[in-house]
Amino acid sequence: DTSKVTDTLIERYFELTLREGNRKAFVDRLKMPKDTITYNNIKHIQQPTLIIWGAQDLLIPVENAYKFQEDLPNNTLIILEGTGHTPMEESPRESLEPVFNFLKTSQ
């Protein structure tokens, strides 16, 4: 959505790729094998957890959000329509309300 992805935002992310080690870290992370042992440990997390996911996330598909919801015992899942991989930047207002509600109710 070009109304959400501004030139300033593109420049910011580009500058992040220029920082020493960032590009290599990103590529290394993509090359890592799937770590199912660590993932399986989330089933033991009892802390209330808020999951906010963009319905149009092209990097990590929304199906993964439902997998987290299934495996994480004490969670609240919010799916934001019309939002991609960075909900807090693409839909800041829509992202903030569930955070406030979660913090109020999970004390």
Where are these regions (language model features)?
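Active-site-adjacent alpha-helix of alpha/beta-hydrolase-fold enzymes
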Residues: 66-75
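Conserved alpha/beta-hydrolase "acid-adjacent" motif
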Residues: 58-64
